[in-house]
């Protein structure tokens, strides 16, 4: 089997997979929503109403800039100060947003029969704060933002946001002081709501099949470590899952928001189609009773920031799975850890990709050698196979039987040239997932004109260089292709590859270029060995 045809087949499979994945992202099958005691309609009815008019409080740490609305105490805006919105910009990336064009908020509160956020009890609570602006000062490791609301029955609710230095996890504590004469029935909830349609200023790649990633909701439960729940799933059927522990989240490329319950009891995960083009996912903790003249503290945690795997894993089990490495996560995760290790020494993600390419190709050298040896043996059999075809004619069954007998006699595996390429395919895909999912590689520069390894080459130089390396491999490789149509396809294969890779991340194209250069070197070494065994001749191209 000819090596160029194998490469072309693998490339077509890869691109077809990416196109299928881009379609599947928006049309994926709906997960089965688990049901228990409470009906889905009851769960959806707990979706929080609009916050309405309230004062805006600004909060700033070394990594976050937040805007909190005193009506309900929701976080309506979150800027990630360490992550520019675009390459070279001084404007930080805005994760949470509340504008006429787009809404993405992190909401929390207390529902239940006595809850101030229960729609049946009127408008959401209007909290008061001692300041309108809070900022973490140098040398300060923790910033607390207390909001206070006193209900008509005398109950005092204090909602406190606790932020720490260099941390994207925000603790949200509710202190309930029941100075009334009646017991309170309260349920803590956390909810994330978002506009389904992206405005232009937030759409960074949905039209590029090679850069298309998942955007939507997700959750982790005792039954499912990680389950995506797309906006179309929310539109079709509201989620209703009863579970201990876990988390609910809204995801997009590189960034996530997530509510992590603290209660050890059974939490209810729900989703809701809110209308006005908005969808929500959230959780409700078990009901809590607060006796008269007593106090109780209810707590939860919000993650709002980049998908940093080690940090997220420390906040909640399986939260690091929100880094979308796809079905090859078991390859992508160790690849990324190795890449991180290399980067810690070389200080450049591009050079780290080059080094990891040499490592991967070095490990796979025995398979590569077996591939070329198998193809060389197949070429040596071509005269016998041609004579067999002339002798047998159109009897396909007899031809197949005698071919298998010949392969067995000559100890040749006809698939031996294809198998190593199929082994390389998952590694190539895993690297693609790693580049598209790892926020560490977002806007990571390499050298010269490459300022973002996760974005396509703006000048298309790397794809062209990749096509040139493929051309050299093609010219240096012996071929058994005699069909004129196949010969034309093989001739244009470097051009086809170049066009495919115009839209691919620069880091992936860099990997492929280096891999091709390694192939050229390994090819020459292997061919010299095959010449000594009489299995290859440089005169036969």
UniProtKB/Swiss-Prot annotation:
Pfam families: 60KD_IMP (PF02096), YidC_periplas (PF14849). It comes from the Bacteria. It is found in: Cell inner membrane. The chain crosses the membrane at residues 7-27, 340-360, 415-435, 453-473, 494-514. One of its GO terms (biological process) is protein insertion into membrane. It is a multi-pass membrane protein. GO terms for cellular component: plasma membrane. Keywords: Cell inner membrane, Cell membrane, Chaperone, Membrane, Protein transport, Transmembrane, Transmembrane helix, Transport. One of its GO terms (molecular function) is membrane insertase activity. Interacts with the Sec translocase complex via SecD. Specifically interacts with transmembrane segments of nascent integral membrane proteins during membrane integration. Belongs to the OXA1/ALB3/YidC family. Type 1 subfamily. Required for the insertion and/or proper folding and/or complex formation of integral membrane proteins into the membrane. Involved in integration of membrane proteins that insert both dependently and independently of the Sec translocase complex, as well as at least some lipoproteins. Aids folding of multispanning membrane proteins. This is Membrane protein insertase YidC.
């Amino acid at each position: 089997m000819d090596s160029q045809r194998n490469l072309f087949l693998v490339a077509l499979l890869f691109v077809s997979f990416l196109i299928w994945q881009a379609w599947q992202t928006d049309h994926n099958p709906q997960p089965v929503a688990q049901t228990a005691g409470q009906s889905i309609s009851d769960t959806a009815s707990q979706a929080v109403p609009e916050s309405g008019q309230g004062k805006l409080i600004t909060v700033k740490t070394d990594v976050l800039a937040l805007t909190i609305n005193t009506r309900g105490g929701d976080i309506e805006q979150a800027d990630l100060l360490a992550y520019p919105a675009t390459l070279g910009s001084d404007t930080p990336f805005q994760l949470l947003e509340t504008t006429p064009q787009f809404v993405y908020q992190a909401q929390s509160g207390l529902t239940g029969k006595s809850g101030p956020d229960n729609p049946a009890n009127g408008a959401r609570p209007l909290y008061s704060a001692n300041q309108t602006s809070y900022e973490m000062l140098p040398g300060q490791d923790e910033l607390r933002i207390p909001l206070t609301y006193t209900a008509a029955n005398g109950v005092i609710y204090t909602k406190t946001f606790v932020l720490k230095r260099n941390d994207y996890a925000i603790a949200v504590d509710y202190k309930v002081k029941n100075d009334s004469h009646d017991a309170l029935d309260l349920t803590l909830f956390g909810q994330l709501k978002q506009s389904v349609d992206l405005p232009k200023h937030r759409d960074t790649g949905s039209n590029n099949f090679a850069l298309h990633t998942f955007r939507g909701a997700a959750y982790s439960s005792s039954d499912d470590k990680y389950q995506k729940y797309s906006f179309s799933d929310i539109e079709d059927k509201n989620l209703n899952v009863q579970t201990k522990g876990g988390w609910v989240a809204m995801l997009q490329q590189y960034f996530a928001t997530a509510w992590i319950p603290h209660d050890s009891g059974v939490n209810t995960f729900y989703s809701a189609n809110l209308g006005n083009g908005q969808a929500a996912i959230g959780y409700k903790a078990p009901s809590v009773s607060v006796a008269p003249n007593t106090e109780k503290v209810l707590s939860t945690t919000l993650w709002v920031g980049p998908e940093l795997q080690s940090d997220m894993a420390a906040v909640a089990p399986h939260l690091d799975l929100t880094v979308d490495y796809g079905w090859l996560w078991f390859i992508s995760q160790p690849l990324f850890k190795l890449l991180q290790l290399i980067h810690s020494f070389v200080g450049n993600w591009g050079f780290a990709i080059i080094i990891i390419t040499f490592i991967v190709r070095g490990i796979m050298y025995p398979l590569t050698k077996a591939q070329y040896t198998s193809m060389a043996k197949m070429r040596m059999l071509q005269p016998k196979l041609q004579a067999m075809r002339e002798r047998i004619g159109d009897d396909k069954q007899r031809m197949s039987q005698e071919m298998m007998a010949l392969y067995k006699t000559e100890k040749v595996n006809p698939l031996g040239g294809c198998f190593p390429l199929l082994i390389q395919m998952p590694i190539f895909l895993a690297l693609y997932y790693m580049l598209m999912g790892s926020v560490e590689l977002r806007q990571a520069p390499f050298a010269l004109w490459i300022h973002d390894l996760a974005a396509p080459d703006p000048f298309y130089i790397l794809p062209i260089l990749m096509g040139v390396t493929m051309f050299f491999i093609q010219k240096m490789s012996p071929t058994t292709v005699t069909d004129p149509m196949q010969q034309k396809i093989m001739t244009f294969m470097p051009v086809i590859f170049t066009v495919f890779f115009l839209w691919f991340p620069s880091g992936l194209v860099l990997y492929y270029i280096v891999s091709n250069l390694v192939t050229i070197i390994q090819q020459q070494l292997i061919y010299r060995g095959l010449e000594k065994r009489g299995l290859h001749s440089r005169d036969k191209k």
